[in-house]
Design a protein with these regions (language model features):
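An aromatic/glycine/proline-enriched structural segment found at the starts
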Residues: 10-20, 207-272, 431, 438-466
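Acidic/histidine-enriched segments that form metal/cofactor-coordinating
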Residues: 11-18, 83, 92-196, 242, ...
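Histidine-acidic residue clusters that define the catalytic metal-binding segment
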Residues: 14-31, 167-206, 238-243, 272-274, ...
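M16/MPP (pitrilysin/insulinase) zinc-metallopeptidase core fold and M16-derived inactive scaffolds
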Residues: 53-115, 175-179, 291-307, 320
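M16/insulysin-pitrilysin zinc metalloprotease superfamily fold
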Residues: 82-85, 113-143, 273, 292, ...
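Flexible, processing/modification-adjacent segments and terminal tails
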Residues: 184, 473-480, 486-487, 541-602, ...
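N-terminal mature ectodomain segment of secretory-pathway/periplasmic proteins
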Residues: 476-555, 580-585
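Gly/Pro-enriched, hydrophobic low-complexity segments
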Residues: 536, 592-677
């Protein structure tokens, strides 16, 4: 007990211990050699596990893709799917048989295997690098997948926001700001892909990194054998105009009528290289501001206000122009307030010195990450690769912790004022203008000056301020709107003769083809079956009063509220029974004005010009919170004299959509007895 008392008297646990000197770091350098074609090879031997990893990086000068943006993505998807010497199926089957993997990215490639299979995998890897298989069928398939992915992302607020903010930051003609479109992808030909490969896939700017259970001698012998004949090409160097910051802080707004939350990006350009003296102060300043969970921005917006799941910042460092960006996603109701709070935190780090304790916590975080990374053999190679590609001092990582430890509170404030440009911030907000724009227009700078708002479409083109006021004739009622819709699709008499409708639709979910069969009757019975490869994987059944859903062998009965919601809409044409529906306003749907009809917890949107239903919004409550599901209808076609939509797009989560294409409608079919049990 005496010993414990003395020990307790010697340590003041209310004070953070004074940090000691930065630990001495010894970093083993990889063994290297270079082929005559310019390929630089790095080898890190590690014999703890019988496996090998290979990375190919082509460090080309910055270049754009001009009128064929997306060609590099198509090339990356095609490479590694067979070679000029081995067909696709044989190639992939052999890799799978060996328990290995080979993957390609944009001007990069990766492979991994057990060490005993490394010679064969390197042969297959090298063959794919030197002799890609440019098959028309594969080209068309990969291009189609890219187009489908692009279509699926067009209603994603996050995807559109990212596209616009990078395009505005760097410019649409700059490699970092360019983006593709469906029209551009459609115009890309196989010859463009071949030309891109011939121009930019060169060993002269390439690095090959081999890490694992190998010897330098064996790797050198194998690489010389497999890659010495990789043809060297002179890669063109192109100059681009240097992007500029906005002259004054401003809001750039992108209207997304389907947005349930706003995407915010507060951006300015920076010129920062990893070799600059400011590099270490800057990464620590950013970490304090928003580089982690305990960053100032996240503590404010998430922990204090509860407005978001996360609010962070990042800053780039490299040979080319970079940017600082603070980003978050918030509810529509707090969009303007979130913008103001981010601006406040940027000012705070510029004007209020951070505490020594906060700085030491950030240093400790970077130190811990750095030390843990060194435990991985691949880190040695990655550091050596970065020294080469970023023109760093050979001892950059040897001195990493020393440089980090030398950063002072004064350094943090100095670089915050230099790199977080309060007066030149581009604040890109992508959201639902009808709910957030008035609040954004009322924001002033922290000094009380007006904050200009500019408007852009989904492709970063400047447009006029959107309008949301849609005049509704005083004589228009819910009954008028519904009757117009009924007449537009076939007329009341024809619709009343429909006793049941069955539709069959196809869709793709996470790359897997699915089929959906849906049946509804005038007795408010409902059946949905989702099938994959002919097997039912999900099912919903409602007999008019009660029902259930089942998936993966698990059955869950509908509760009272779920049953009531299904009963309300489980009709071939619920509008025929919508006695209590009311006209609640008008909104733009896909840029066109539509009347909004409320029927219980469901809203129907009808195009003012065509009268057709273009959107259904169902609101449900779960765990005390309301959420809405939007389903868009389009491509109406005639079936047995009735106009029905052949395409529906359902927003299943923010940024996620399920698109179904109806292959057939069957009206008044004979139904199996007991199918709704």
């Amino acid at each position: 007990m005496l010993f414990i008392g003395i020990a307790g008297a010697q340590i003041d646990r209310s004070k953070q211990p004074t940090p000691g000197p930065a630990p001495s770091i010894e970093i083993t350098k990889p063994q290297t050699f270079e082929l005559k074609n310019g390929l630089k090879v790095m080898v890190v031997e590690n014999h703890k596990l019988p496996q090998v990893r290979v990375q190919l990086l082509i460090d080309n000068p910055m270049h754009g893709e001009a009128n064929v943006v997306g060609v590099s993505s198509i090339l990356a998807r095609m490479m590694g799917n067979g070679t000029a010497n081995i067909d696709k199926d044989s190639y992939n089957e052999e890799i799978d048989y060996l328990g290995a993997s080979i993957n390609f990215g944009n001007e990069s490639a990766f492979a991994s295997s057990l060490s005993k299979y490394f010679p064969r995998i390197l042969t297959l890897f090298a063959d794919a690098v030197k002799n890609p298989l440019f098959a028309e069928e594969e080209f068309n398939a990969q291009k189609s997948r890219l187009i489908e992915n692009l279509k699926a992302s067009e209603k994603s607020v996050a995807e559109v926001g990212s596209r616009v903010n990078t395009a505005l930051t760097y410019g649409k003609n700059h490699p970092k700001g360019e983006f593709t479109t469906e029209e551009v992808l459609e115009g890309i030909q196989l010859a463009n892909v071949k030309n891109y490969y011939d121009t930019f896939f060169s060993p002269s700017n390439a690095y090959l990194v081999v890490v694992g259970d190998v010897t330098f001698k064996d790797v050198k012998k194998l690489v010389k054998k497999e890659l010495s004949d990789w043809k060297k090409r002179d890669v063109p160097r192109v100059t681009f105009n240097t992007p500029k910051d906005v002259q004054y802080t401003q809001i750039n707004f992108v209207d997304m009528p389907n947005a349930v939350q706003s995407e915010i990006a507060v951006i300015n350009l920076v010129e920062l290289k990893m070799s600059d003296e400011d590099y270490f102060p800057v990464i620590l300043a950013n970490h304090i501001l928003g580089g982690g969970f305990n960053g100032m921005i996240n503590l404010n917006l998430r922990e204090d206000k509860g407005w978001t799941y996360g609010a962070y910042s990042g800053i780039g460092a490299g040979k080319e122009i970079q940017r600082f960006a603070a980003t978050t996603s918030v509810r529509n109701q707090v969009t303007d307030s979130a913008v103001v709070e981010i601006m406040k935190e940027i000012r705070n780090i510029r004007t209020v010195p951070v505490t020594e304790e906060r700085l030491e916590v950030s240093k400790a975080s970077y130190t811990g990450n750095f030390v843990r990374a060194l435990e991985r053999p691949s880190t040695i190679a990655q550091y050596a690769l970065r020294v080469e590609t970023q023109d760093l001092d050979p001892d950059f990582y040897v001195n990493y912790l020393k440089k980090l430890n030398e950063v002072t509170v004064e350094d943090i404030q100095r670089v915050a004022n230099k790199y977080f440009k309060e007066d030149n911030l581009r604040i890109v907000v992508t959201g639902k203008g009808s709910e957030v724009l008035e609040g954004l227009k009322s924001i002033t700078t922290l000094d009380g000056k007006p904050l200009p708002v500019k408007y852009y479409d989904r492709f970063a083109n400047e447009v006029e301020e959107p309008t949301y006021e849609i005049e509704i004739d005083a004589n228009i009622t819910a009954e008028n709107v519904i009757n117009t819709y009924i007449e537009a699709i076939g007329g009341k008499d024809k619709l009343q003769n429909v006793k049941n409708i069955t539709s069959e639709a196809s869709m793709t979910m996470q790359g897997m083809p699915l089929t959906m069969k849906t049946t509804v009757t005038t007795d408010r019975q409902y059946l949905l079956e989702v099938s994959m490869s002919g097997m039912v994987v999900q099912k919903q059944v409602f007999d008019g009063e009660k029902g259930y859903q089942s998936a993966q062998g698990q059955r869950l009965d509908f509760d009272e509220e779920q049953a009531a919601a299904i009963k309300q809409t489980a009709l071939p044409f619920p509008e025929l029974e919508a006695k209590n529906a009311t006209l609640v306003g008008a909104e733009f749907v896909n840029g066109k004005p539509a009347y909004v009809i409320q029927n219980g917890k469901t809203k129907w949107f009808y195009d003012q010009e065509t009268g057709l239903k273009v959107l259904e919004r169902i609101t449900q409550e779960m765990q005390g919170q309301e959420f809405s599901t939007n389903t868009y209808f389009s491509d109406y076609k005639e079936f047995e004299g009735i106009m029905l939509p052949t395409k529906s797009t359902t927003e299943i989560a923010p940024g996620m959509e399920a698109e179904a294409n109806v292959d057939s409608y069957m009206i008044n079919e004979s139904l199996d007895e007991g199918m709704f049990d």
